[in-house]
A protein has these predicted regions:
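An N-terminally biased module of ancient metal coordination in phosphate/nucleic-acid-related enzymes
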Residues: 1-94, 104, 166, 170-175, ...
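Conserved active-site loop/cleft motifs that coordinate metal ions or position small ligands
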Residues: 192-194, 224-230, 259-261
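Mid-to-C-terminal alpha-helical segments outside catalytic/metal-binding sites
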Residues: 240-265
Length: 265
């Protein structure tokens, strides 16, 4: 079974609608039940109301209603076996925040997580996993802070995403990391230790994210973390060893681990 500390939760789950995940929605639920989870959340990549641009990494706007319907039906079907929450993973694209607020109310979302993949936008912006210069890190940090100030987000997903492609944990990386961590503490929301990043690092053959120096700093500053499986296939839920290693790493870094996030309703 998953989780040596009995924290049997995960709020970072994708679906095949995002075009880079496998399996049916129900297969994720069944896998989570098999692994002994008490509560999971679906948080697929949000659509945005783009005009003239089609993203390859997220559902279309017209798919949102069916996504919501599916998750709510599964929540009812398996309510005696597992608690299921409805959410989205969203960037902070300032021009679309009013639209996001409408979506939250219309579809009665339980939560939204901040996965800030692009700055300042997807179509013409920088992918924050591969920043090209120090200023890209500063821009990422500034938008993370502005996003947290909206009060919409339950936690910051893969806050150290930039270390996937940034050359070193230099002075800028450390300063940016410190400001993101302190903002999460000020807002009383966790930062996420992302297990998909662990797989990326293994594929690259070097440390990317989660990045040790970032999490060492998080421990020193007194941050709180959630573990995010960032599930892109149902069998992600039964990768017990990766989950346990994450718990051990956070303990080593002195980072407090929580199973509580703030819900919108």
């Amino acid at each position: 079974m998953i989780g040596s500390n009995e924290m049997k939760y995960n709020y970072h789950t994708h679906t095949s609608r995002c075009n880079h995940a496998d399996g049916s929605d129900e297969e994720y639920v069944l896998s989570a039940i098999e692994a002994g989870f008490d509560e999971i959340g679906f948080s697929d990549h949000t659509p945005w109301p783009y005009r003239g641009f089609v993203s390859a990494m997220r559902m279309r706007e017209q798919e949102l209603a069916s996504y919501v319907k599916s998750v709510k039906e599964l929540r009812d079907k398996y309510k005696d076996k597992i608690s299921i929450k409805l959410g989205l993973e969203c960037e902070y694209f300032k021009e679309y925040i009013p639209w996001l607020r409408e979506v939250i109310d219309k579809f009665e979302l339980d939560y939204v997580i901040l996965g800030h993949h692009f700055t300042p936008n997807e179509q013409y912006g920088v992918y924050n996993g591969f920043p090209s210069c120090a200023q890209d890190l500063v821009n990422y940090k500034n938008e993370i802070i502005e996003a947290v100030d909206t009060g919409l987000f339950s936690y910051i997903a893969h806050p150290d995403l930039f270390m996937r492609g940034y050359s070193s944990f230099d002075k800028t990386a450390k300063k940016v990391s410190k400001e993101i961590i302190l903002k999460s503490i000020e807002a009383d929301i966790p930062i996420e230790y992302n297990l998909m990043g662990v797989l990326h690092s293994q594929t690259m053959g070097r440390e990317g994210y989660p990045y040790g120096e970032f999490w060492k700093l998080a421990g020193e500053l007194g941050a709180t973390a959630v573990i995010g499986i960032d599930a892109h296939s149902p069998d992600s839920y039964t990768d017990y060893e990766r989950y346990r290693k994450a718990e051990e790493a956070l303990k080593t870094y002195g980072v407090k681990l929580t199973d509580k996030i703030k819900f919108l309703r």
